[in-house]
């Protein structure tokens, strides 16, 4: 009998495994070193133990085929973003996730794909028949919470691109819409609800919506919800969501093919209230950090116009500051023919005056969004800015998070934000999807409460720190820590 030849373990094979870049290897050839390099390439770090390897391509994920076809063929999302690469495998494995990533990094798809996969894997009989019955029609299978109407509408619009093709009903529950509209939109069954916290609590108390079958919860921009005073509303909503014990003591675990409730949370920062929610509600979450989230944004050039003693931190209109603003806009419009500018102010009155004064100076293509504008006017303004019919959007912080407008070329802080986190969120409107962005911030001594955080942010992020900030008295009282 002839002896079997041993499997080849030549030097060439070993060299291929050790020296070839991960992009030239099949999935089963990936080594621990390859995965480390892959994570470094995409700026992915994690903690929490047993973190699944990131996604290299859409085809390597366990995504239902009809959903995968929509992602790649219909919507043409050809490559996952870093947050999608990191979060989707973890969530598909029914792991709770805390994602810390910049706004504009592709978070929406990072939580929509696992949620839709979960719904599509639900028992077919329940999905096609029982869910539409009287006892279940108003009980969504997934809930997405967002801090603002604008972000909720944006998420709804993205989710409906999938829902319309999959036969799933996605409904938004936000202020500015009548309760009767919600009742009408869920009459034949609702699969996903996208809501702001306050409005959802009202709808739950009125029994318009029930969360008895909602074992999949997503909180987007959770830190922003806390900053806006929604912590109590969040706690109330969480009390309506069924527990893992409830899941396992009923037939629901067989219907939904899960062993635990699933929660995905996305945030730009981890504050004590966020840690409290994570500890009390999430189950052994995996923490994902993308691209040094929370550090200075490398792709945004940050400029500061220091104005010395307090000149413009109130509702009074500062004409000298405005003259500088006009010069900045004029220069930017000369350098960039396809410019889009967002100007932030802290007061509604200042926003309205900015709009009028800019119009007098020839910039008629501007729109305003703030809390006193009706929902219809806000939506119209955002649509006009997104389509480039209007080149300048003037806003209070109601627009600082979540409004996804591609190719914003410049952000101007006419007034520095009162909270430092809001500064990061504001300038994060520009420089999205890897593009270069630029920001200008007017700042004076009335803003000194944020100077220490600003100095730390710039120093830790490797940015040039202005001399006036280094030498300012308010930044001398605390030693910067790495």
Curated annotation (Swiss-Prot):
Chain positions recorded as ATP binding sites: 101-108
Annotated EC: 3.6.4.13
CDD domains: SF2_C_DEAD
Helicase C-terminal domain span: 321-473
PROSITE patterns: DEAD_ATP_HELICASE, HELICASE_ATP_BIND_1, HELICASE_CTER, Q_MOTIF
Taxonomic source organism: Scheffersomyces stipitis (strain ATCC 58785 / CBS 6054 / NBRC 10063 / NRRL Y-11545)
Ranges of residues in domain Helicase ATP-binding: 88-288
Domain notes from UniProt: The Q motif is unique to and characteristic of the DEAD box family of RNA helicases and controls ATP binding and hydrolysis.
Keyword Electron transport: no
Keywords: ATP-binding, Cytoplasm, Helicase, Hydrolase, mRNA processing, mRNA splicing, Nucleotide-binding, Nucleus
Family statement: Belongs to the DEAD box helicase family. DDX23/PRP28 subfamily.
Motif residue range(s): Q motif: 56-85
Gene Ontology MF: a single term: nucleic acid binding
Functional description taken from the UniProt entry: ATP-dependent RNA helicase involved in mRNA splicing. May destabilize the U1/5'-splice site duplex to permit an effective competition for the 5'-splice site by the U6 snRNA, resulting in the switch between U1 and U6 at the 5'-splice site. May also act to unwind the U4/U6 base-pairing interaction in the U4/U6/U5 snRNP, facilitating the first covalent step of splicing.
Predominant cellular place of this UniProt entry's protein: cytoplasm
Catalytic activity: ATP + H2O = ADP + phosphate + H(+)
Localization per Swiss-Prot or TrEMBL: Cytoplasm; Nucleus
Oligomeric form and interacting partners: Component of the U5 snRNP complex.
Keyword Secreted: no
GO biological process, one term: mRNA processing
Protein name in UniProt: Pre-mRNA-splicing ATP-dependent RNA helicase PRP28
Major enzyme class: hydrolase
Positions occupied by motif DEAD box: 220-223
PANTHER family: ATP-DEPENDENT RNA HELICASE DBP3
Gene Ontology cellular-component annotations: cytoplasm; nucleus
């Amino acid at each position: 009998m002839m002896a079997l030849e041993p499997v080849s373990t030549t030097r060439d094979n070993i060299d291929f495994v050790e020296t070839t870049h991960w992009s030239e290897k099949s999935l089963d050839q990936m080594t621990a070193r390859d995965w480390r390099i892959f994570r470094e390439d995409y700026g992915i770090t994690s903690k929490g133990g047993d973190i699944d390897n990131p996604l290299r391509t859409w085809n390597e994920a366990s995504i239902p085929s009809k959903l995968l076809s929509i992602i790649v063929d219909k919507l043409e999302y050809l490559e996952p973003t870093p947050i999608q690469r990191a979060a989707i495998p973890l969530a598909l494995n029914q792991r709770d996730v805390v994602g810390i990533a910049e706004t504009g990094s592709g978070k929406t798809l990072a939580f929509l794909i696992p949620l839709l996969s979960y719904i599509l894997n639900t028992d077919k009989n329940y999905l096609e028949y029982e869910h539409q019955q009287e006892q279940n029609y108003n009980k969504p299978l997934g809930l997405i919470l967002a801090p603002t109407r604008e972000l909720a509408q944006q998420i709804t619009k993205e989710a409906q691109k999938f829902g319309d093709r999959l036969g799933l009903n996605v409904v938004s529950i936000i202020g500015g819409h009548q309760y009767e509209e919600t009742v009408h939109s869920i009459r034949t069954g609702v699969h996903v609800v996208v809501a702001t916290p306050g409005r959802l609590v009202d709808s739950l108390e009125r029994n318009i919506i029930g969360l008895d079958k909602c074992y999949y919860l997503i909180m987007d921009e959770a830190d922003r919800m806390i900053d806006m005073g929604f912590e109590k509303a969040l706690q109330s909503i969480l009390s309506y969501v069924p527990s893992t014990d409830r899941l396992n003591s009923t037939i629901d675990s067989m219907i939904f093919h899960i062993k635990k409730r699933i929660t995905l949370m996305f945030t730009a920062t981890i504050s004590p209230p966020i840690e409290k929610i994570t500890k009390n509600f999430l189950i052994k979450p995996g923490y994902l950090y993308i691209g040094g989230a929370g550090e200075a944004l490398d792709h945004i050039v940050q400029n500061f116009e220091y104005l010395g003693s307090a000149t413009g931190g109130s509702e009074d209109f500062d004409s000298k500051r405005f003259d500088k603003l006009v010069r900045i806009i004029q220069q930017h419009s000369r350098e960039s023919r396809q410019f889009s500018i967002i100007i932030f102010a802290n007061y509604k009155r200042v926003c309205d005056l900015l709009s009028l004064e800019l119009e007098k100076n020839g910039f008629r293509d501007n729109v305003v969004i703030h809390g006193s504008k009706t929902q219809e006017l806000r939506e119209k303004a955002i649509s006009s800015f997104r389509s480039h019919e209007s080149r300048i959007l003037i806003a209070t912080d109601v627009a600082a998070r979540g409004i996804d407008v591609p190719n914003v070329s410049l952000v101007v802080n006419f007034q520095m934000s009162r909270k430092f986190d809001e500064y990061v969120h504001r300038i994060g409107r520009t420089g999205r999807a890897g593009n270069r962005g630029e920001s200008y911030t007017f700042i004076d001594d009335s803003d000194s409460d944020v100077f220490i955080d600003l100095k730390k942010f710039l120093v830790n992020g490797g940015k040039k720190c202005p001399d006036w900030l280094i030498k300012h008295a308010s930044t001398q009282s605390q030693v910067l820590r790495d």
